Swiss-Prot record:
It comes from the Bacteria. It comes from Burkholderia vietnamiensis (strain G4 / LMG 22486). Belongs to the LpxB family. One of its GO terms (cellular component) is membrane. The keyword Lipid biosynthesis applies. GO terms for biological process: lipid A biosynthetic process. The gene is lpxB. GO terms for molecular function: lipid-A-disaccharide synthase activity; phospholipid binding. This is Lipid-A-disaccharide synthase. Its EC number is 2.4.1.182.
């Protein structure tokens, strides 16, 4: 069935940098399949803007982490959400696409769906890991879910939610065999000798909580492995500034801080010490041994612990269905423990070979041409809507 010939309008919301990456991938796929006149608007980041996206609000207004930490931003977030819903109901786009940010987007998606506007959500929340009761909210809010991981559609099907497994765009982007030598040349690092990438996060609260511990662990590792070098990507000038007091407190470290280029930094490494998050999947796709860690404020940690179901939080372990890399969380994330675990990952060649096999299988499973699959699923929803009109 052909799509409408009049101008299509698709409203989209991405609430944080990882969502901006996914949404930009989807936009590229849609622009290859929908008329050039299609108007894409809503809330997005720099990657979406590069695709001509019309962002009516700044994405960073929605970027929060943790229960307690979000309290101060709630009034502003509620104001933006209210304005967005009023705009959607007045303009009635052909579909609303929420990209991740479920606590924000599900409310908007339900309002859109109740008004007869198809609602699509890109990235199934981790209901299989914690807060499984959210599946009821999904069933009320979402017409179609675009899933990054292969086991998610079966879970959604039980709740009557239509879905499509589209794979993960990082698996399409990252080559199956990383070029470690080329990455070291790009960063001006020696071709020989051990390199450890350290990624403590990108938010002020993350740096404050885990930054000192990571730097203390690096100091211990350098004592125990004298030839080791460290590389740490700083996504923004503001993040580099946040790191400066920690750098100044450890002048002995053989540390290179890069301006962004986190993927290049991880590619150059022999092992990685990383804060839990999407970046751990990126590290797995780069076939790197790693140690996963995080620290959150005590109350946030207690809430998360009580609502969790899986024994692991890192995506490599979740996808493998078992611990394939170590996780050191909260009070277990001491400098000594992090240093010991990271050096073990660095030195254990047999474990490195095993991880390469596990991560290669994972990579192939997730490599689905996500931009095309996700865009095709959206087009099908639009065609179904036209068929009902």
């Amino acid at each position: 069935m052909p799509l409408p010939t009049n101008q299509l309008r698709l409203a989209m919301v991405a609430g944080e940098p990882s969502g901006d990456l996914l949404a930009a991938s989807l936009l590229g796929g849609l622009q290859a399949r929908l008329p050039a006149s299609t108007h894409y608007y809503g809330i997005g980041g720099q990657r979406m803007l590069a695709h001509g996206f019309d962002s009516h609000w700044q994405m960073d207004k929605l970027t929060v982490r943790g229960y307690v930490e979000a309290l101060g931003q709630i009034p502003e977030i509620l104001r933006i959400r209210g304005e967005l819903k009023r705009q959607l109901l007045a303009e009635r786009p052909d579909a609303f696409i929420g990209v991740d940010a479920p606590d924000f987007n599900f409310n908007v998606e339900q309002a859109a769906r109740d008004a007869g506007i198809p609602s699509i959500h890109f990235v199934c929340p981790s209901i299989w890991a914690w807060r499984g009761g959210r599946i009821k909210k999904i069933a009320k809010s979402v017409d179609h879910m675009l899933c990054l991981f292969p086991f998610e559609p079966a879970i959604l099907d039980k709740a009557g939610v239509a879905s499509t497994y589209v794979g993960h765009p990082l698996a399409d982007e990252i080559p199956l065999e990383p070029d470690t030598h080329g990455a070291r040349i790009a960063l001006g690092l020696p071709a020989d000798g051990p390199v450890i990438a350290v990624l403590p996060g990108s938010r002020r609260s993350e740096i404050a909580l885990i930054g000192p511990t990571f730097f203390a662990a690096m100091a211990l590792m350098q004592e125990r492995e004298p030839g080791v070098r460290f590389v740490m990507p700083a996504a923004t000038p503001a993040l580099r500034e946040l790191l400066q007091p920690l750098v100044a407190a450890h002048p002995q470290l053989a540390l290179t801080i890069t301006d962004g280029r986190s993927q290049v930094a991880m590619t150059a490494a022999d092992a990685i010490l990383v804060k839990s998050g999407t970046v751990t999947l990126e590290a797995a796709l780069l076939k790197k041994p790693m140690v996963i860690s995080y620290k959150v404020p005590w109350l946030t940690g207690q809430i998360m612990r009580r609502q969790g179901y899986l024994p692991y939080v890192g995506l490599p372990n979740i996808l493998a269905g078992r611990f394939v890399v170590p996780e050191l969380l909260q009070h277990f994330a001491t400098p000594e423990a992090l240093a010991d675990a990271t050096l073990t990952q660095l030195r254990d060649d047999a474990n490195r070979r095993t991880l390469t096999e596990v991560f290669t299988e994972m990579h192939l499973s997730l490599r689905q041409n996500t931009a095309a699959k996700a865009a095709e699923a959206v087009v099908r929803v639009l065609e179904q809507r036209k068929g009902r009109a």
